[in-house]
Amino acid sequence: MRVVILGSGVVGVTSAWYLAKEGHDVTVIDRQDGPAQETSAGNAGQISPGYAAPWAAPGVPLKAIKWMFQRHAPLAIRLDGSSLQLRWMWQMLRNCDTSHYMVNKSRMVRLAEYSRDCLKDLRAATGIQYEGRQGGTLQLFRTEQQFDNAAKDIAVLDDAGVPYSLLTAEQLATVEPALAKVAHKLTGGLRLPNDETGDCKLFTERLAKMAEQAGVKFIFNRSVDKLLVEGDQIAGVLCGDDIIKADAYVVAFGAYSTALLAGLVSIPVYPLKGYSLTIPITDPASAPFSTVLDETYKIAITRFDDRIRVGGMAEIVGFNTQLAPARRETLEMVVRDLYPHGGDISQAVFWSGLRPMTPDGTPIVGRTPLKNLNLNTGHGTLGWTMACGSGQLLADIIQGRRPAIVADDLSVARYRAGFQPLNIAPLHDIHPIR
């Protein structure tokens, strides 16, 4: 079968890889000059299934109001008056209750845990190297309230079967030695030992080369103008004067998927702007060992081979990719506070990207009402975490094979009135980990 994939970020490339392994004739189209040039280029580097959770959670609306007046707030909103933004924000607010949160989180954890297993299998099969580490993630708490809340909320992890350990401030240095010097600023941490880290861009570039060797064709520097429809299916992709035809099509355009699908399939995917700093390491002993997540500022600090990646924050500002100096100040403040001697901040590379977010936090993976059109988008801040699982899942669906995990509630059909997912036991009715 001929398959055209639109988008060469980590989600598009993993989709291409798994489809090619099934024997399909795969073509990937992207407007950039190579893979992983946009959202996948500078993310925080976390592969954190245990922390897979929607931004839409109980208490977030009130927190968002408070954050409006804080200099280093993790979330910022700038209204542009567009119907897309207002509608998406309203849908997100409707998901900010405990019942929706538990359903959405259970979906996200299911896919994220599966994705980590797929990545592990891919790594074993190919030997792909991407500065990956299997050292876990350590969530850091700065207040007693944060620590106490975590102690109450670990039932979420128990329910999902995710290993964890709750550490006191004195125990943090046993897993992150450089934190010994700043333990007095912290009240403890929650460690997930099975989480991983790695350079998403490097992974995507190298997997793209492997996919090309497996027969995948990449067409770069080519903008997609329109999807052509005949009856109940896609007839081709219009790229300038050319029409590229296939038997099946996959939209993996990230935050730009919504506009491409306008008038064909309605999806609630909106850009959530994030930032990162990439800092050269000057003293390995003073740098993080794996990944730490600052709960107060929602900032992740990740270790690559000879670099530190500091990433996070969320701005609801439309498709604006300009670099905001105030956001750099926040990233610098957090890394200086926790790892003051780990790297040379004066040589840091500042970056921003647009994460494709759904209002319920769950990505959209699967078929659409157009019988040969498939979606793999809306992964938000967890594209790297969920990429391999989403790619394998989509390949199974296109192949007509029953997926390894329940997937009906991951498709766009879940937004349809009257949708009834398969019966899956929900997570415990407790407060979310935030």
Curated annotation (Swiss-Prot):
Pathway membership, UniProt: Amino-acid degradation; D-alanine degradation; NH(3) and pyruvate from D-alanine: step 1/1
Enzyme type, top EC level: oxidoreductase
Gene Ontology CC entries for this record: cytoplasm; plasma membrane
InterPro entries reported in the protein's UniProt record: DadA, FAD-dep_OxRdtase, FAD/NAD-bd_sf
Keyword GTP-binding part of the UniProt annotation: no
Chain sites annotated for binding FAD: 3-17
The keyword Chaperone appears for this protein: no
GO molecular function term, any single one: D-amino-acid dehydrogenase activity
Catalysed reaction, written as an equation: a D-alpha-amino acid + A + H2O = a 2-oxocarboxylate + AH2 + NH4(+)
Cofactor: FAD
Biological-process GO terms, alphabetical: D-alanine catabolic process
Stated family: Belongs to the DadA oxidoreductase family.
Protein name: D-amino acid dehydrogenase
Source organism: Yersinia pestis (strain Pestoides F)
